[in-house]
């Protein structure tokens, strides 16, 4: 049994990611990391984030999936964005992505937005959004559309809201009173939280105790704001300051 870090929605915020890594160093031995997508866009350092993940990341990456921003930018499909400023940000990000970044996103990241795997005998699903839509629809407590009963743990991102909850499904298992428990974990966003907490957020799962540590890490937001291009709407700067 081991400890695993769950990281999502970095969004071009290398400063926040580095502080998360500094915090993770102090949490004991970490067997591996689950990455849930949206490494790029909104923030000012998409290329630098990808370079860090590809060349400097100190942990084994067990799961690495596209988020909706990777999908939109790599396929040049901006039709699902809810605002023009979102489209403009994505198109600008696409214009500055390096060949190395494009190669990584094309060849080293799962394009499907979801990944099924096993952790210490537990059946796991990682999905950027949800089974309703792998990229654009989120899981929320009490609103987990889709059938997750085949899994023991479901990791998801996209919403930028951290959560941890359990749901019981009917199952043919008299020993467990015909119930199957599924643990849902959303680590929140490293690079652009929206849950009224401006700190970088991620989670650690201990599969021995099944304890989930929802981490919240301060970082130098002013340093990030100084790096933004004028091509990016100020709205995305304000989200870092307010955490909404």
Task: Show which residues each predicted segment covers.
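Active-site environment of divalent metal-dependent phosphoester hydrolases
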Residues: 11-16, 41-44, 69-74, 132-134, ...
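Short beta-strand scaffold segments in enzyme catalytic cores
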Residues: 112-117, 162-166, 201-205
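Core catalytic region of metal-dependent phosphoesterases/phosphodiesterases
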Residues: 2-7, 12-102, 106
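Acidic, His/Gly-rich catalytic cores of divalent-metal-dependent hydrolytic chemistry
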Residues: 170-244
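Active-site-proximal loop/helix segment associated with metal-binding centers of metalloenzymes
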Residues: 97, 110, 124, 129-141, ...
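Beta-strand-turn-beta hairpins that frame and shape the catalytic cleft
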Residues: 1-5, 116-125, 178-182
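Active-site-proximal segments of metal-dependent phosphoesterases and phosphodiesterases across multiple
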Residues: 81-87, 120-149, 169
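Active-site neighborhood of phospho(di)ester-bond hydrolases with catalytic His/Asp-centered motifs
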Residues: 7-8, 33-37, 63-68, 127, ...
């Amino acid at each position: 049994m081991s400890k695993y870090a769950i990281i999502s929605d970095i969004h071009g915020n290398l400063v926040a990611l580095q502080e998360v890594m500094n915090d993770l160093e102090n949490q004991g031995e970490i067997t591996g990391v689950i990455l849930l997508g949206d490494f790029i866009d909104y923030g000012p350092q998409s290329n630098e984030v990808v370079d860090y993940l590809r060349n400097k990341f100190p942990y084994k990456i067990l799961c690495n999936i596209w988020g909706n921003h990777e999908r939109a930018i790599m396929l040049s499909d901006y039709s699902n964005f809810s605002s023009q400023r979102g489209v403009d940000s994505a198109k600008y990000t696409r214009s500055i992505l390096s060949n190395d970044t494009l190669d990584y996103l094309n060849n080293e990241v799962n394009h499907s937005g979801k990944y099924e795997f096993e952790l210490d005998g537990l059946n796991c699903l990682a999905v950027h959004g949800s089974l309703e839509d792998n990229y654009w629809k989120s899981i929320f407590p009490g609103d987990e559309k889709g059938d997750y009963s085949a899994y023991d743990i479901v990791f998801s991102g996209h919403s930028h809201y951290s959560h941890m909850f359990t749901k019981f499904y009917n199952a043919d298992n008299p020993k467990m009173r015909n119930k199957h428990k599924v643990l849902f974990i959303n680590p929140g966003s490293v690079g652009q939280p929206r849950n009224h907490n401006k700190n970088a957020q991620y989670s650690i799962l201990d599969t021995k105790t099944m304890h989930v540590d929802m981490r919240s890490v301060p970082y130098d937001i002013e340093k990030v704001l100084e790096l933004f291009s004028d091509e990016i709407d100020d709205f995305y700067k304000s989200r870092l300051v307010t955490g909404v």
